[in-house]
């Protein structure tokens, strides 16, 4: 059967619908295309274009995590697209729609493709194919701080051809804003979960708009209607219908719940299921094809729903007796391949020569529409805007530099030229460098924030990777320069480093270059790491050897030959070496009385030898070069410039690594876990297809509470107003989002909240559900005739629009967790499990019940997440249920099933309020009441819908607005909601003002009277609750502990990396100081190894920040639902992390301790005590990381301040600067430092009564010592330190504190626990 002719102004008549669409007047907010004299659309395209696509035996597979294993995604597809035609893809999520589009867009990465895929008779030209294709992806990934207009303009600047004038670009942006009804939002930021921006539906239109900028011949749109109401979807598809008719553009569109009028706009239909094609052919022949197989479309049934459901539930449409002749994707696909329809399509593929008259040929064009210099400029401008918009992060970086500069400046204020301050200069230089290094950890979050957008734009060839890479570098320079200058000025001049302009400039340059270099290092790690959590683990582990082998903690002569290569490749070594040479070279040092050997301030110093020291002593270091010599550094002044060049070269190397990984690595999470697949297959064997009529809510125990309390919940609200604070013209004002809303819901009632995008539906739902965290609410809300109490969460549940779910749980575990924590504690576990199993079956989740939910693209699809989200809330068996867009992201079959379930829950006596965007006729019939809002949050209608929407439509008919009998009533009411409409009433012209007419209506008067009288009948029993939580504390502890433990063990990569990092660094540190003897040199090495071991615990702890941040969103949702107590949540989270903290500490400590030769007694007591202190220190640092993750809003800021805290802790612990050298004004900080006490304990544990000796090179000879005989002799050799107690005295550590300080360590654990609890209870970083 030949496809219909293309190029006509109208598409063929559909057998199941009405006359097809032709160019129409403007409807609602979106604009119809305007034409110039030549018939071309004004402001968008200037020439006709199109693309002829043919696919023969197209198949695709992708590798799994199991080596050598492949998973089929597409199987043997045959289809075509012609210029001017529109093809609709239907199929349940996971059917392969996205894979088809990626293949057509030539955006494949790890997939293996076979078969033939031709574009205008040729294979895809990899260089220019993207210039002819516009691909609207499923997800809405944008730079959150950019406004809608800026987002479109950026796309226009880079996707419109070189030479296009600014006027043309702006005209196209204006056109798209008007077309997508975003003109009013053009100056609103796009936003994300942390930054309030446009609504979900508006964000989807932004996603579409950035691709509409292109002069594309082929439009690919993957579920563009998600989050849009039905009217907006229809208008959008009409626009593309016009575009196809006039400009011969070929379109392939995947939709989930298309209405009849939307479906009629398409020429061809493609139905997919599980990667198989079960139909491709003319839309007009689709129904007759399936009727030929024995499946009939019921009367008044949406054909799109019929097409989507027929493979999964063939028994619903089979006319004959017995079992349907076909079941499953493969059987339907084989039937199609054996049909005359398929043969007709194959003949067209084989015999039809592509008519390229209307086809745009871009093969002669350059790969990118704009030159590289222009790409770099635009990408850099965007990066600078991103930087400026992140005001909190920028301020934190500057404040951090000022604070640290002042701390160091006052701590090391006015350094002298004695021995102690000579060492302090070295410590200051090393610490300053570490501060610069660790400040770069915030770059991990910066890159991950932009990475998904970069992937999309890289695939779309907006710019070369090099342009994006340079934008990251350029945008970092100003802020790095500013924070470096502030820090260096304070540190250098307050500390009294050499007052020399050249040396100061060098100090500034080295720190600045080092800052940029390590920013690039952290971004390089982020470019290849699969997620931010692993990046936060890998980066410190890779950095630790560089720090250890920098020459400060382990001088060059102490490093064994097997590790000396790390010393030579450590960038920190060269930076430290350059700064040390810059400061120490040329300085002359002296000794205070206490610093000479022997000290001049000893009582017998002036007595002749051997009764005293004969008034003679030696000052060991008198020149700065001797400090350099001790560390094995060059003693000439010019080599520091070589060091600077080497650090710059390392920065360039890290930058190249970042560029390489950005260019060549594209993290793709679609490769499934074989264990998940295996579990899912087992589950699918047990699954049974059930009709909705078989879902007995009472058997499912969804009316358990009703047996105890015969009613649901009465809720009423009056004069409800909601306002938010905004700034306009520099003044604080209040913007009203809801304006005097009235309404109610009662048991058995299913109330729909509807209105166009931006009308305030979700806002109203949040206010009613008590989920708003900001703004100002006025008016009255009563629950069962009383004000809302703290027990409100016991009787209510809220299905949020955004599906925030625990990523490591399986589907069944997530729903079961909700049931066990929210159902009554006296309900047996067996009944709870049965209850959950019925929910899983009803929501068609049985096949994936054992699959992990995952995060982002990793794990479940959008549709599956939505159903799991609904299941989690249904598991609480609520009396009052709020749902925000429960069908968004679902196909029509799944959406109808969900709404049937919700309707039955309402029928069982529950009260339900539900926002909904684009309900089909079948779905809209489920609602018995409607609250209709217009933009601005004003009521247009509140009342019953009536049988077949008779009451609702009757209200509008009374005002002269008649709904076409074949039109979906839901679409009709949205069409007439917003504007004043000119109509006729009783034969006279009439203006319909939606809000005013409702206020004056009898409906409104009756509603107000009912609310004033009270919705709840007098004498109705009210449920009483005796606790905030449904479950006992014991149940909460068990369930939270189980979930938290499984979350830990399922992060396999994280655990593996975490433990390998500990083992690696333990072996490295142990072999660096292998079998230390009790010599003078090894005194300092022992102190270094003990200090580094503790600080490694700090670095290890900070890597948990992304995990805590990821869990935080789930916690916010569950806490708002009243699932569990905060202390129990926190306690179980910490307890389940303890084994991994213990393993990390032990795996590090064992090789480090025994290989290095730290102190051992026959009973092993020093080792066990050291291990215990290491474990407690690691645990405290892990708790400190949780404090930062819960208190601070983003990963970037938490990492930045966590690095600062770690730096300050290491500074005041007593290693960098001995306690005696700490200024009195800062001594309290030394005493507050949580690292001070474990360091003191492990030092006492190691050095107490330990004997030391000197090698021949370490002993000191004192010349010209006066003896009792009156002669002068050389006395020596003298060993400066012979007992470890001398070291303890130098660091002001007392042996009796070895066990006393344990109480302080545990005190910090309690303190951090309290801080985390307070943060979880009172701080929310997600605003509503």
From Swiss-Prot:
Chain's gene name: abcG2
Domain ABC transmembrane type-2: from-to ranges: 388-665, 1049-1286
TM spans (from-to): 398-418, 428-448, 477-497, 504-524, 534-554, 559-579, 642-662, 1059-1076, 1087-1107, 1128-1148, 1172-1192, 1197-1217, 1303-1323
GO function term, MF aspect, one: ABC-type transporter activity
Function: Required for endocytosis and endosomal pH regulation.
InterPro entries the UniProt entry points to: AAA+_ATPase (IPR003593), ABC2_TM (IPR013525), ABC_transporter-like_ATP-bd (IPR003439), ABC_transporter-like_CS (IPR017871), ABCG_dom (IPR043926), ABCG_PDR_2 (IPR034003), P-loop_NTPase (IPR027417)
Disulphide bond pairs: none
UniProt cross-references to CDD domains, sorted A to Z: ABCG_PDR_domain2
Residues holding ATP: 91-98, 755-762
Skewed-composition ranges (Basic residues): 678-689
Compartment list: Endosome membrane
One GO biological process term: endosomal lumen acidification
Domain named ABC transporter: residues: 53-299, 721-960
Record-level GO cellular component terms: endosome; endosome membrane; membrane
Gene3D superfamilies for the chain: P-loop containing nucleotide triphosphate hydrolases
Keyword match Translocase: no
Membrane topology, from the record: Multi-pass membrane protein
Region (Disordered): 670-691
Effect of a null allele: Cells that have a abcG2-abcG18 disruption have an endocytosis rate roughly 70% that of wild-type (or rtoA disrupted cells). Disruption on abcG2-abcG18-rtoA cells have an endocytosis rate roughly 20% that of wild-type. The exocytosis rates of abcG2-abcG18 and abcG2-abcG18-rtoA disrupted cells are roughly that of wild-type; abcG2-abcG18 endosomes have an unusually high pH, whereas abcG2-abcG18-rtoA endosomes have an almost normal pH.
Protein name in the entry: ABC transporter G family member 2
The family this protein is said to belong to: Belongs to the ABC transporter superfamily. ABCG family. PDR (TC 3.A.1.205) subfamily.
